[in-house]
Amino acid sequence: MIIIGEKLNGAIPVVKKAIEEKDEAFIRDRAIAQAEAGATYIDVCAGTAPEIELESLKWMMDIVQEAVETPLCIDSPDPEILKAVFPLCKKPGLVNSVSGEGNKMDVLLPLFDDADPTWELVAMTCDNAGIPNTVEKKVELTKMMVEEAKKHNLTPNRIHIDPCVMALSTENHSFLNFKAEIEGIREIYPDIHITSGLSNISFGLPARKLMNQNFMTLSMFVGMDSAVMDPTSRDMMGAIFATDALLGNDRLCRKYSKAFRQGKIGPVQAK
C-alpha cells in the first residue's frame, strides 16, 4: 500500500497556524512522525492565500527535506506553483495533481519529459465541468489523461488515478461506483495505481474515522493501492497491515507481525 501522509496541509487549522507563525518545530515534528509511521510520501500543501502560497510551500519543503528522507508529494491546486517548486525537490517524489481542468496538463506534463523516471503523478478525474457523476465519464477522463501523459514519458505504472470518490452522505452508491471505476480503469491499464483521499467518503457523517477505516479496507479489496491518509493513526495502519495479509500479499504475515513488534499497530505497549 502506497501511503501519502496528509498531515502537512494548510487546510488543517493547526497547520495553517504553524505556517502563519513560521513554526518550524511543528512542521518538522509532523514530518518525522509521518515518516516513522511508514509514509511512502509526505504531502506538503501550503493551502494559504495565493499571494504567499509559493513562499509558504518552499518554506515547508525546506523543513521537511531537512528532517526526513521520505520523498515529497508536492501539492497545490495551482499548476504554476507546482512547476516552480518541482526543481526544489531533493529526490523524485509525487506531483499532486493534474486533471482535465484548465491548463493543468499543459503546464505539468512537460515537467516529466526529462525528469528522473521515478517521479510519479496524481491525476484526478475531473475537468472544467467539475467531477463527473457517471462511472463511464470518469473512465473516459482517465484514458484521456493517461494517453496524454504517455507523450511525456509517463507510463501508467507511474500514475495514481484519483476517481474523486463522492461523500456517502450525498451519494448512496458512492463506494459501489468507486468499485466500478476501479474495475473500468484497470481493465484498460492493469498496472496503474488507484488512489483516494480517504476522508472524502465520510464527509457529513458522524464517527468519520470508523467510516474511513472500513472504506479503506473494502477499497483495498477491490484494487485501491494508494491513499492520502494519516499514517500516524494506529487504527488505520493496523487495518492496512491486516487487510494486506488477508489479501495474500504478506507472506506468512511477516509484515503484519513486524509492525506489531515495532509498536506501529495494536494496543500501545508499555515501555
From Swiss-Prot:
Induction: Up-regulated during growth on proline betaine or L-carnitine. Keywords: Methyltransferase, Transferase. Residues 1-247 form the Pterin-binding domain. GO terms for cellular component: cytosol. It catalyses: methyl-Co(III)-[quaternary-amine-specific corrinoid protein] + (6S)-5,6,7,8-tetrahydrofolate = Co(I)-[quaternary-amine-specific corrinoid protein] + (6S)-5-methyl-5,6,7,8-tetrahydrofolate + H(+). Its EC number is 2.1.1.-. It is an enzyme of class 2 (transferase). The keyword Transferase applies. One of its GO terms (biological process) is methylation. GO terms for molecular function: methionine synthase activity. Pfam families: Pterin_bind. InterPro entries: Dihydropteroate_synth-like_sf (IPR011005), Met_Synthase/Corrinoid (IPR050554), Pterin-binding_dom (IPR000489). It comes from the Bacteria. The proline betaine:THF methyl transfer system is composed of two methyltransferases, MtpB and MtqA, and the corrinoid protein MtqC. The L-carnitine:THF methyl transfer system is composed of two methyltransferases, MtcB and MtqA, and the corrinoid protein MtqC. Involved in the degradation of the quaternary amines L-proline betaine and L-carnitine. Component of a corrinoid-dependent methyltransferase system that transfers a methyl group from L-proline betaine or L-carnitine to tetrahydrofolate (THF), forming methyl-THF, a key intermediate in the Wood-Ljungdahl acetogenesis pathway. MtqA catalyzes the transfer of a methyl group from the methylated corrinoid protein MtqC to THF, forming methyl-THF. Belongs to the vitamin-B12 dependent methionine synthase family. This is Methylcorrinoid:tetrahydrofolate methyltransferase. The gene is mtqA.
